[in-house]
Design a protein with these regions (language model features):
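Generic low-polarity alpha-helical segments
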Residues: 1, 13, 107, 118, ...
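LRR N-terminal entry segment and analogous cap-like coil->beta motifs
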Residues: 1-48
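Short, solvent-exposed loop/turn at the beta-strand->alpha-helix junction
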Residues: 4-11, 30-38, 56-64, 82-87, ...
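A structural signal for leucine-rich repeat
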Residues: 15, 37-43, 61-69, 87-96, ...
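Inter-repeat linker/turn residues at the boundaries of leucine-rich repeats
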Residues: 19, 30, 42-45, 56, ...
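Conserved hydrophobic beta-strand positions in leucine-rich repeat
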Residues: 22-27, 50-52, 76-78, 102-104, ...
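Intrinsically disordered low-complexity regions specifically enriched for long asparagine
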Residues: 53, 180, 234, 250, ...
């Protein structure tokens, strides 16, 4: 008979003194339930970080208990907790004001309501991963822009309901932003990218893979405003030409990585402009 390793490990934890435990990692422990999460909360009053990614049995009940009982929580990974909804996320927003990092990758039942609760209650957030949260739209992202001025990294890969309004709010409110992934945000245009160029001068990496509506206008805004840029992915941005690439070459002297697969309008002239960066 196959041994239930996830259950054994948690039982071992709960049989010893865990009053000083600050970090617990349970990634992929598929038999972890809400009751187990509640037991951990009761026995680990100093908990600062918990990883429950791929714990498919964990629901809003367990996450809400974390919100109510772990006011010092700073980091939580709930990626691919497929039963999680806005109710659990709202509880974190209400109770975890010190939260700095949250990963909700693949939590596709979470909507703007949950993300708005984080924006309202978690002003210390530095890192947010909403990759493939395809029900999150501009309202949720705008709430993060308004409430999370310390945000440094946000992943919106595959959030195809996010467009210029949400991204522009990040540009206005998140001046410390260093990394943003907007890959396959199909509705994004130059307006959102221009806002990032104007407001996010510390930006180091941006991923625009598949953002086919972005043109030289948006890319040139990044070149003008993001002098610390080190990595940019423009794969599939078929409207970008030499003009945009040349603007990056002129303004982004720290650029190390650029991806142009599918940029069929870029010619030798644009590549030559990038080549001049490498000679500095």
């Amino acid at each position: 008979m196959k041994r239930d390793t996830s259950r054994v490990r948690v039982c071992d934890i709960l049989q010893v003194d865990t009053s000083d435990v600050v970090t617990i990692g349970l990634r992929g422990c598929s038999n972890i339930t809400d009751q187990c999460v509640m037991d951990i909360i009761n026995r680990c009053p100093k908990l600062r970080s918990i990883n429950l990614s791929y714990c498919g049995k964990v629901t809003d009940a367990g996450v809400s208990a974390l919100g109510a009982g772990c006011g010092q929580l700073q980091s939580i990974d709930l990626s691919f907790c497929s039963k999680l909804t806005d109710a659990g996320i709202a509880a974190l927003g209400a109770g975890c004001g010190q939260l700095q990092s949250i990963d909700l990758h693949g939590c596709n039942m979470v909507t703007d309501a949950g993300i708005s609760a984080l924006g309202a209650g978690c002003g210390q957030l530095h890192s947010v991963n909403l990759s493939e949260c395809n029900k999150v739209a501009n309202a949720g992202i705008s709430a993060l822009g308004a409430g999370c001025g310390q945000l440094q990294s946000i992943d919106l890969h595959g959030c195809n309901m996010v467009a210029d309004a949400g991204v522009s709010a990040l540009g206005v409110g998140c001046g410390q932003l260093q990394s943003i992934d907007l890959s396959f945000c199909y509705n994004l245009t130059d307006a959102g990218i221009t806002a990032l160029g104007a407001g996010c001068g510390q930006l180091q990496s941006i991923y625009l893979h598949g953002c086919s509506r972005v043109t030289d206008v948006g890319v040139s805004a990044l070149g003008a405003g993001c002098g610390q840029l080190q990595s940019i992915d423009l794969c599939g941005c078929s409207r970008v030409t030499d003009a945009g690439i040349s603007a990056l070459g002129a303004g982004c002297g720290q650029l190390q990585d650029i991806y142009l697969y599918g940029c069929n309008m870029v010619t030798d002239a644009g590549v030559s402009a990038l080549g001049r960066i490498c000679l500095r």
